């Protein structure tokens, strides 16, 4: 692939791989450690998971602002150095047995992680030509799929072979490798700081809020961009539903005696589907218009969710999960390849920083609704699938009608020309 001829992208790609490897291995190994060490207190494992998602609430206002105002390369690199340092502290804290302090370190480390993606994603926009954006999104989706399929297995293998201490050391090494790869990138200053030079001394809470508000207004004024950001809300909605529905389906229907095993098989089937869909989506992204690459898989996904609720046959359930994963892959590639073309580089950090909060909010909202409805108000879990399927089909109708119109109205940004603009000049809506 031509994209791998770009040395900066190769380094950023493998930096993201190393960073994701460290995060996945460390998190999963720590979950197994808590289950072994505190088998009578499974709530500890749940609390650890909460430490990975809760920081979003506290930092979402500033992650995008930091990526836009400060040197993006240094932000991404320093995220790795800080996480490596916190991993060392975590290593020694484990020997003290002070679990509340361990949770505190996990919380801080996860909060630092939230700053990595907006900075790294903004750098990718700067170093690639627009025809490579979809390929980059596809490669990132493949990474996510691989860790989704093998993440638990890798974490379990590392925990059983080198123990929690070895897994944390591997965690540390992964962050160091990621930091060194980012440091080795040769990216022009204007691409790293498209808004001009800035320092911590100049910042204030009021300025950060104003910058965040500017990012929100920029999204709302661009109908196509707002529609794409809404796509991440839908991803969160689906993630929230499938975080618990397969488990409930197995426990109360298809396989009550071995529901843990079959829930894992569902996740693997979905992950392999994501991987296959990412490959297919990457290959056809140049031949298919992005609004079709996005809307048609959403329609098929809606129908497949009905199948998941209707079927009483395990292999059909797994096949539908695999096909559903194949639909999600192209949708993500369409969004990831489209967004950098229409977002001004001066605001790319703030736009990227909105993705995780939207997903987390939708995921939390969905989990709350499932907890409220099942089994008190909805005793048959199939109806939850049908409700989700109806919502997805309504989203398809909206996208099928709106995206072609919004796409025709949108103007693509010439990223290289944008970097030549005066730093003090406000970014125009596109």
From Swiss-Prot:
Q: Which GO terms describe its cellular component?
A: plasma membrane
InterPro entries linked to this entry = Drug_antiport (IPR004751), MFS (IPR011701), MFS_dom (IPR020846), MFS_trans_sf (IPR036259)
Q: Which domain of life is it from?
A: Bacteria
SUPFAM superfamilies linked to this entry: MFS general substrate transporter
What Pfam family does this protein match (any one)? MFS_1
Q: Does the keyword Membrane apply?
A: yes
List where in the cell it is found: Cell membrane
Q: Does the keyword Nucleus apply?
A: no
Q: Which UniProt keywords apply?
A: Cell membrane, Membrane, Transmembrane, Transmembrane helix, Transport
Give TM segment ranges: 13-33, 47-67, 88-108, 138-158, 228-248, 264-284, 296-316, 319-339, 358-378, 383-403
In Gene Ontology terms, what is one molecular function of this protein?
transmembrane transporter activity
CDD domains to which the protein is assigned, alphabetical: MFS_MefA_like
The Swiss-Prot or TrEMBL record describes its family as follows: Belongs to the major facilitator superfamily.
What is this protein's name? Answer: Uncharacterized MFS-type transporter YkuC
């Amino acid at each position: 692939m031509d994209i791998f001829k770009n040395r900066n992208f190769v380094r950023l790609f493998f930096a993201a791989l190393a960073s994701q490897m460290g995060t996945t291995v460390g998190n999963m190994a720590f979950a197994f450690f808590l289950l072994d060490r505190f088998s009578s207190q499974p709530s500890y494992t749940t609390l650890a998971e909460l430490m990975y998602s809760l920081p979003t609430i506290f930092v979402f206002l500033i992650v995008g602002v930091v990526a836009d105002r400060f040197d993006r390369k240094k932000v991404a690199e320093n995220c790795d150095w800080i996480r490596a340092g916190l991993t060392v502290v975590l290593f020694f804290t484990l020997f003290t047995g002070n679990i509340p302090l361990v949770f505190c370190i996990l919380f801080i480390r996860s909060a630092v992680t939230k700053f990595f993606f907006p900075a790294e994603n903004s750098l990718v926009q700067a170093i690639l030509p627009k025809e490579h954006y979809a390929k980059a999104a596809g490669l990132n989706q493949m990474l996510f799929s691989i860790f989704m399929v093998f993440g638990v297995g890798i974490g379990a293998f590392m925990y059983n072979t080198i123990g929690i201490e070895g897994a944390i050391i591997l965690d540390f090494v992964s962050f160091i490798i990621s930091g060194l790869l980012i440091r080795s990138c040769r990216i022009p200053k204007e691409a790293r700081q498209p808004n001009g030079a800035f320092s911590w001394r100049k910042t204030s809470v009021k300025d950060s809020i104003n910058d965040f508000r500017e990012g929100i207004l920029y999204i709302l004024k661009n109908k196509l961009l707002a529609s794409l950001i809404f796509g991440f809300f839908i991803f969160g909605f689906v993630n929230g539903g499938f975080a618990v529905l397969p488990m409930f389906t197995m426990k109360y229907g298809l396989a009550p005696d071995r529901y843990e095993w079959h829930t894992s098989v569902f996740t693997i089937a979905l992950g392999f589907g994501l991987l296959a869909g990412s490959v297919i989506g990457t290959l056809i992204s140049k031949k298919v218009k992005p609004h079709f690459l996005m809307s048609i898989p959403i329609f098929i996904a809606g129908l497949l969710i009905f199948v998941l609720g209707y079927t009483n046959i395990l292999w059909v359930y797994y096949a539908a999960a695999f096909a559903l994963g194949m639909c999600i892959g192209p949708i993500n590639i369409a969004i990831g390849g489209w967004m950098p073309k229409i977002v001004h580089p001066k605001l790319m950090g703030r736009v990227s920083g909105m993705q995780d909060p939207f997903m987390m909010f939708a995921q939390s909202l969905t989990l709350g609704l499932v907890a409220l409805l099942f089994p008190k108000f909805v005793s048959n879990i199939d109806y939850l699938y049908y409700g989700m399927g109806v919502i997805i089909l309504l989203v398809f109708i909206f996208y099928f009608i709106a995206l072609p119109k919004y796409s025709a109205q949108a103007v693509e940004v010439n990223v290289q020309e944008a970097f030549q603009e005066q730093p003090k000049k406000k970014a125009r809506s596109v």
